[in-house]
Regions:
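Acidic low-complexity intrinsically disordered regions
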Residues: 1-92, 96, 103
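Basic, flexible Lys/Arg- and Gly-enriched helix-loop patches that mediate nucleic-acid binding at interfaces
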Residues: 16, 69-325
């Protein structure tokens, strides 16, 4: 594995004069404003109340519980179908999957917020098979297969989106621990583009994230020279013609500006090669700096350049739900 990292990786550029290019702190201010959801699902104290799982709009989502003795009898009747005598206790499996501490998982179960194979479970004594049982908390799936890995990488500029580069240039593997080289990146960022890459060994999830039919949105911060004419926004939203067909952004928002430069946020679901750079070239405003800050519900937040973190249980659950898993 090549251990050489790109020069300047992770450093904060020197502050320039106002009116010059945006500095690292300007990008971090914009990225940091979007970091809230990336913190959900982190470690919790054992005495904290059971957490809510969240929709992307921030509203809590709870599983509806059946009412009355009839519903209770129906649930108990189904327990025999989902109970595995030789399996592991449900709260232990949930805790191992990173949902919460075992005690908090017991609270989630007793509140009727956990389903196993479509059956609401309220008794922590139920045993399940981690390999075959489908577990959901507040409707969000829980990943119980410990062999599968899901990582979030903040790619620095100058890093090649590949595991091994025959020319010896810095690659993704430069930043991974021993034994993680078997993971593959979902999509790619060109050499000069920074930001969020998902790394996994889950082939089905990767295929769905890349398939255009699922239209997974990607969010970018784009720096270009200013001033930017008002018509550029409408052009990009209406669509521009590229050599491989038309392309358009789903949304366009001006987030900051100086006398000489403009910082915008664009959202699009296309995964074509260098699509953002080519679209801005087409409207006469070449990209100076490009950072991907979000894929679906996964946020870059304040994650440091060159760092790799494990995707938390809630992020993974929402990401899978977005692509029908």
């Amino acid at each position: 594995m090549n251990s050489r990292k790109p020069r300047g990786s992770g450093r904060t550029p020197a502050v320039g004069k106002r009116g010059g290019p945006f500095q690292e702190r300007d990008f971090q201010r914009q990225i940091g404003a979007r970091k809230g959801a990336g913190r959900k699902g982190g470690p919790r104290h054992r005495d904290e109340p059971a957490p809510d799982f969240y929709d992307e709009d921030g509203r809590t989502r709870r599983t509806r519980r059946g009412k009355g003795a009839g519903a209770a009898r129906a649930r108990e009747k189904n327990l025999g179908r989902i109970h595995h005598e030789d399996g592991e206790r449900l709260q232990k499996v949930m805790a191992a999957a990173g949902v919460a501490s075992r005690r908090v998982c017991e609270d989630l179960i007793s509140e009727g917020r956990v389903e196993v194979d479509g059956v609401v479970v309220t008794e922590p004594g139920v045993r399940v098979d981690p390999k075959t049982s489908v577990i959901r908390v507040d409707g969000v799936s829980v990943q119980t297969d410990v062999a599968k890995q899901y990582l979030v990488f903040n790619k620095p500029r100058g890093v090649i989106s590949t595991m091994v580069d025959p020319d010896g240039r810095p690659s993704i593997a430069t930043y991974l621990k021993s034994g993680q080289e078997h993971l593959f990146h979902v999509g790619r960022l060109d050499n000069e583009t920074e930001g969020l890459l998902v790394l996994t060994n889950d082939g089905e999830l990767a295929n769905r994230l890349l398939h255009p039919s699922y239209e997974v949105p990607k969010t970018y911060l784009v720096q270009v020279k200013g001033p930017l004419p008002k018509g550029v926004s409408n052009q990009l939203k209406a669509g521009v013609e590229l050599e491989d067909g038309p392309a358009k952004v789903d949304s366009f928002k001006l987030v900051d500006s100086t006398p000489g430069h403009v910082l915008v946020e664009v959202v699009l679901h296309s995964g074509k090669n260098r699509i953002v750079r080519r679209m801005f070239d087409a409207v006469g405003h070449p990209v100076e700096r490009l950072v991907r800050v979000k894929i679906g519900p996964i946020l870059l937040g304040d994650q440091k350049q060159g760092s790799v973190r494990v995707m938390n249980a809630q992020e993974l659950g929402h990401l899978k739900a977005m692509v029908g898993l």
